[in-house]
Amino acid sequence: RKTAGKPKN
């Protein structure tokens, strides 16, 4: 699951 609110770096 992708964590929401984190910038995709």
Swiss-Prot record:
One cellular component term from this protein's GO annotations in UniProt: photosystem I
Primary localization class, coarse: plastid
A GO term for molecular function: metal ion binding
Free-text comment on the cofactor: Binds at least 14 chlorophylls (8 Chl-a and 6 Chl-b) and carotenoids such as lutein and neoxanthin.
Post-translational modification: Photoregulated by reversible phosphorylation of its threonine residues.
One GO term (biological process): photosynthesis
Residues found modified as N2-acetylarginine: 1
PTM-bearing positions, type Phosphothreonine: 3
UniProt subcellular location: Plastid, Chloroplast thylakoid membrane
The entry's keywords: Acetylation, Chlorophyll, Chloroplast, Chromophore, Magnesium, Membrane, Metal-binding, Phosphoprotein, Photosynthesis, Photosystem I, Photosystem II, Plastid, Thylakoid
Membrane topology: Multi-pass membrane protein
Description of how the protein assembles with itself and partners: The LHC complex consists of chlorophyll a-b binding proteins.
Domain notes: The N-terminus of the protein extends into the stroma where it is involved with adhesion of granal membranes and post-translational modifications; both are believed to mediate the distribution of excitation energy between photosystems I and II.
Family per record: Belongs to the light-harvesting chlorophyll a/b-binding (LHC) protein family.
Role noted for this protein: The light-harvesting complex (LHC) functions as a light receptor, it captures and delivers excitation energy to photosystems with which it is closely associated.
Protein name in the entry: Chlorophyll a-b binding protein
Organism in which the protein naturally occurs: Spinacia oleracea
Taxonomic placement: Eukaryota, Viridiplantae, Streptophyta, Embryophyta, Tracheophyta
